[in-house]
Swiss-Prot record:
Keywords: Cytoplasm, Lyase, Schiff base. It catalyses: 2-deoxy-D-ribose 5-phosphate = D-glyceraldehyde 3-phosphate + acetaldehyde. This is Deoxyribose-phosphate aldolase. Belongs to the DeoC/FbaB aldolase family. DeoC type 2 subfamily. It is an enzyme of class 4 (lyase). Catalyzes a reversible aldol reaction between acetaldehyde and D-glyceraldehyde 3-phosphate to generate 2-deoxy-D-ribose 5-phosphate. GO terms for cellular component: cytoplasm. PANTHER family: DEOXYRIBOSE-PHOSPHATE ALDOLASE.
Amino acid sequence: MTDLTKSSLRALQLMDLTTLNDDDTNEKVIALCHQAKTPVGNTAAVCIYPRFIPIARKTLNEQGTPDIRIATVTNFPHGNDDIDIALAETRAAIAYGADEVDVVFPYRALMAGNEQVGFDLVKACKDACAAANVLLKVIIETGELKEEALIRKASEISIKAGADFIKTSTGKVPVNATPESARIMLEVIRDMGVAKTVGFKPAGGVRTAEDAAKYLAVADELLGADWADARHYRFGASSLLASLLQALGHGDGKSASSY
């Protein structure tokens, strides 16, 4: 098994296979769930809009993969600073049956100097998720924060407020995940001593098996070769799946979208 084959198999099992498009339909979500079950193993999760959670749950159960988790998004993609709305959306996602919620951090408020609203918003969503045994991932939108100090600060605030994962991006802005932002966020997890309890998710722009291998190499370097398992690492992607399957000798994987 080559290094690329090994990293591709790892990456596939760490994928949150994603469709977050305005034209998503039940049929597209059903197709996504089918894609999540591959000849070389299942993806960790599918990531979809909240209204599609019931059809995704039904499809995953019917195809014999009830262990594929369902992630969804709230306060998305804008990252506004209205805590009541973010919390209401998160509670609604939980009521739909989400296993995991990816909430967007109010990154523009942080850029304007307000650190408190980000903490309060994440904490409110975390409290709701914790009560329902739902995992909370916090999207800090690194491509908009841009500066290392802001990426670091948003990561730290999210972790202090209870994030189970910190995630780079919505996939809806010009610059999404980059190896540089991944390194900063992984360093925060390491430096805060929370590697046992906090995971990391690069999202948007991780499109090839080679891309995935580079991201995993950074995690292995900073946090050890055994750290990046499904409880601590996810890839938010869709087109990546076809590339991983090709690297694993199962070509013709068709992706749901360009995320």
